[in-house]
Amino acid sequence: GYCYPCFIQSPNTSECILRPELCRAQEGEARDMEWSKEHCLKAHYVYISLTAGAKIGVTRATQIPTRWIDQGAVKALKFAKTSNRYEAGCIEVEMKKHISDRTAWQRMLKNQIDESIDLYKLKEQLINLLDERYRNFILGNEIIETFSYPHKSFPEKVKSLDLLKVNS
């Protein structure tokens, strides 16, 4: 939704918004260092959530539980805590080798949720796969947060809409 000049200059569209492992604010490099101090150089969590299936994700500490609710998580568990966005992104990249970082939104909306997934067990499996250099960020004794959402029924079919083509 940004014009090109804004897209390449706004801190809101920095590469690290979608790819935290590319953040350079911790090295003093940013489109807007004041913005980065509030968004990138703050505590971040790496989390495991259950939407349709399990996924790994990153969010600022101030965005818990908002991020989980935005993504439609029915369960979520903090995995690691870091002092900045870059560190959280590096852990997420390691974990994406073993667990998705995407929400299967079609299955989620149809309520096809794999309730058999044990987030505590999954966390232990992921810790065992995590590079040693990231283990000091791992959190212990975290509780699983659970969420439920009001609904009348679930759709049988779900498809995306191109809002630019609606009513065209």
Predicted regions and their residues:
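Non-catalytic accessory segments flanking enzymatic or RNA/DNA-binding domains
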Residues: 1-168
